């Protein structure tokens, strides 16, 4: 966020059509993936650029499953067609012109792809050299069908103690 603020990069976040709020999956993996994608969106953006992030639920044919779609679109420098072929390979970096000024190990995208695939998801992208990149990540999640029951139990007690109450008279 600090680098985005210094470069005056605007970040817009939109949650659309999310039905199920309690899902079973790996929040740590999702966080790591999104951090890698957003880090690149900021790092390879332009001053006064823009990053658009969205999250949308895509219903599944299986009643206990759903898919979350994350989109990250930036107005950055984009990727050459040649680099797009190897963006998910370890240590791959684009070394053309001003790109060499961007520090990195070339591991962020391969790690993100591996984590997404471990969760049973997919990652695709479109990029235009000089115009920006859009990543689309789809990850399946199991719906926590028991969350409603746990919520009902919480509502019954309301967190109030029965200490000192005369229940049986």
What are these regions (language model features)?
Residues 2, 77-78:
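Glycine-rich G1-box
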Residues 6, 33-36, 82, 138-169:
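Disordered, acidic interdomain junction associated with two-component signaling
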Residues 21-25:
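Conserved micro-motifs of the catalytic ATP-binding
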Residues 41-42:
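Short helix-loop "hinge" at the ATP-lid/N-box region of the Bergerat-fold HATPase_c
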Residues 79-93:
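Short conserved segment of the HATPase_c
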Residues 103, 108, 112:
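Short alpha-helical Gxxx[C/S/T] motif in the catalytic ATP-binding
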């Amino acid at each position: 966020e600090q680098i985005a603020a210094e470069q005056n990069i605007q970040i817009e976040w939109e949650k659309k059509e999310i039905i199920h709020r309690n899902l079973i999956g790996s929040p740590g993996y999702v966080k790591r993936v999104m951090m890698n994608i957003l880090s690149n969106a900021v790092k390879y953006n332009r001053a006064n650029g823009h990053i658009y992030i969205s999250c949308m639920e895509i219903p599944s044919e299986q009643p206990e499953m759903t898919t979350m779609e994350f989109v990250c679109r930036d107005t950055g420098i984009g990727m050459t067609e040649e680099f797009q072929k190897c963006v998910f390979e370890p240590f791959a970096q684009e070394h053309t012109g001003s790109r060499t000024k961007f520090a990195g190990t070339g591991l962020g995208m391969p790690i993100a792809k591996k984590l997404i695939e471990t969760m049973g998801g997919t990652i695709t992208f479109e990029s235009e050299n000089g115009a920006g990149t859009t990543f689309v990540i789809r990850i399946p999640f199991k719906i926590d069908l028991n969350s409603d029951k746990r919520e009902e139990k919480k509502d019954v007690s309301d967190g109030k103690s029965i200490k000192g109450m005369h229940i049986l008279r």
